[in-house]
């Protein structure tokens, strides 16, 4: 089972399935969805004890949030939503749960075969994004 430290580092997107459908379910407009589909972001994860930072960098946009594991905080997402978010490390996975306007979404990050697998779920829509470690 992975530790949060094993998720640390710079990861580059190499495969994505269902991202447009997931963004549509979030309520993201067509222009932002098209830009999001073209982006091949790097995800940089750092953790110092219970303090977590996740930065997403692409040529289009860079977003970042920092939090304490287990504590709710306000996150501004890449598409501009303000969410009440909590991150926990459970069963070898980093689970980010977002709530806003009576809606919710869960983003789970875990290691599988040396790759970072990110699963985004809202309602019955699931998106899977695969990242490889950048050395």
UniProtKB/Swiss-Prot annotation:
Hexadecanoate binds at residue 131. Disulfide bonds join 120-127. Its main location: cytoplasm. (9Z,12Z)-octadecadienoate binds at residues 129-131. It catalyses: hexadecanoate(out) = hexadecanoate(in); (9Z,12Z)-octadecadienoate(out) = (9Z,12Z)-octadecadienoate(in); (9Z)-octadecenoate(out) = (9Z)-octadecenoate(in). The modification N-acetylalanine is found at residue 2. A motif (Nuclear localization signal) lies at residues 24-34. Changing residue 33 to A: Loss of ligand-induced nuclear import. The modification Phosphotyrosine is found at residue 131. Pfam families: Lipocalin. One of its GO terms (biological process) is epidermis development. Keratinocytes; highly expressed in psoriatic skin. Expressed in brain gray matter. It is found in: Cytoplasm; Nucleus; Synapse; Postsynaptic density. PANTHER family: FATTY ACID BINDING PROTEIN. Forms a beta-barrel structure that accommodates the hydrophobic ligand in its interior. Belongs to the calycin superfamily. Fatty-acid binding protein (FABP) family. Monomer. Homodimer. This is Fatty acid-binding protein 5. The gene is FABP5.
């Amino acid at each position: 089972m992975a530790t949060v430290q094993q998720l640390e580092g710079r990861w580059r997107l190499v495969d994505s399935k269902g991202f447009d459908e997931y963004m549509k379910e979030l309520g993201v407009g067509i222009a932002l969805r098209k830009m999001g589909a073209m982006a091949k972001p790097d995800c940089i994860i750092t953790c110092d004890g219970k303090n977590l930072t996740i930065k997403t960098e692409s040529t289009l946009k860079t977003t970042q949030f920092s939090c304490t594991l287990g504590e709710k905080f306000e996150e501004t997402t890449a598409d501009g939503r303000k969410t009440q978010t909590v991150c926990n490390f459970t069963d070898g996975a980093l689970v980010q749960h977002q709530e806003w306007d009576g809606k919710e979404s869960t983003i789970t990050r875990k290691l599988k075969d040396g790759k970072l697998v990110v699963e985004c779920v809202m309602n019955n829509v699931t998106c899977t994004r695969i990242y490889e470690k950048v050395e």
